[in-house]
Amino acid sequence: MIRVLFMGTPAYAKTILEALWFSEEVEVVGVVSQPDKPVGRRQELTPPPVKESCLRLAPHTPLFQPENLKEERWAKEWRALEPDFIVVAAYGKILPKVILDIAPCINLHASILPLYRGASPIHESLRRGDAWSGVSAMRMEEGLDCGEVLGCSFVEIKEEWGVSRLFEELANRAAALTLKVLKRFSEIRPLPQVGADSSYCRKIRKEEGLVGFVNAKELYDQFRAYKVWPGIFLRSELKLKEITLLSETGEHHMGEILAINKEGVVVGCKEGSLRILMVQAPSKKEVDAVSYVNGKRLGVGDILF
């Protein structure tokens, strides 16, 4: 039986954790997740998905939510669990060396390393319009996602996929890859990352959702990447809640309404065009785009801004 201490926080990590629980060859000896955080307008204290899964499926498994990993007691308690491995998936904090030294630490990073090291690899892959993504199992060491690679799983990104769908696909691939690496760990010949090929992605900021009608394909890719948060919005703070890419070519006045029909509002970009289906004005409810432009008395040839 392979003894695993698991560290993770969001739904991506929950999928991996549940695969470990349902494996007959793995024993999860402890779960570490971020502390509960206020969520929504009411700021209700909400447990992360990994904690919810732990309480539902394995309520007797030791569960830890440390504020500060550098406190000596955490390394002491986790070492006492005698894990063979520490599996880390989107935990959200950098692990100090004292924890890395407890047992081999395997991180499931949602990119093909060394591409997109850092906090938002899935969003970055969509924002750049990549045709492929994937997950990497990496032997952790001090530094940001720079350890030796133990295995990868590739995923072809379909054009209609947004961030939620790609998250789901990568989580399933990561779960399968985790079990494979744990079972074959002693046989694997790790591959060092080539630093010259590396790229980095930071934590997403709200202002990155600001868009303009310059390039239709790039705007659509921003929508795919940021649909969950922060969303995409114009300078007027009008949120574009649902859009589709019509054409990557064709030159238009930026924001010009090209057509209004039952399928939505077609808007031109400096390069290409989009169909807008749903929008949301500041402090208003989400409405279909046709109702919005009709309410604003906008017609074909007018500018949406």
Swiss-Prot record:
Query: Which residues are noted in the entry as (6S)-5,6,7,8-tetrahydrofolate-binding?
Result: 111-114
UniProt-listed Gene3D superfamilies: 3.40.50.12230
One GO cellular component from the entry?
A: cytosol
What UniProt keywords are attached to this protein's entry? Protein biosynthesis, Transferase
Per the record's keyword annotation, is Transferase included, yes or no?
A: yes
List the InterPro entries.
Fmt (IPR005794), Formyl_trans_C (IPR005793), Formyl_transf_N (IPR002376), Formyl_transf_N_sf (IPR036477), Formyl_transferase-like_C_sf (IPR011034), Met-tRNA-FMT_C (IPR044135), Met-tRNA-FMT_N (IPR041711)
Concerning CDD domains, the annotation shows: FMT_core_Met-tRNA-FMT_N (cd08646), Met_tRNA_FMT_C (cd08704)
Which GO molecular function, any one, fits this protein according to its record? Answer: methionyl-tRNA formyltransferase activity
What Pfam families does the annotation carry? Formyl_trans_C, Formyl_trans_N
Enzyme nomenclature, EC number:
2.1.2.9
Catalyzed chemical reaction(s): L-methionyl-tRNA(fMet) + (6R)-10-formyltetrahydrofolate = N-formyl-L-methionyl-tRNA(fMet) + (6S)-5,6,7,8-tetrahydrofolate + H(+)
Q: Does the keyword Lipid metabolism apply?
A: no
Functional description taken from the UniProt entry: Attaches a formyl group to the free amino group of methionyl-tRNA(fMet). The formyl group appears to play a dual role in the initiator identity of N-formylmethionyl-tRNA by promoting its recognition by IF2 and preventing the misappropriation of this tRNA by the elongation apparatus.
Quote the PANTHER family the UniProt record gives.
Answer: METHIONYL-TRNA FORMYLTRANSFERASE, METHIONYL-TRNA FORMYLTRANSFERASE, MITOCHONDRIAL
Q: Which family does it belong to?
A: Belongs to the Fmt family.
Full protein name: Methionyl-tRNA formyltransferase
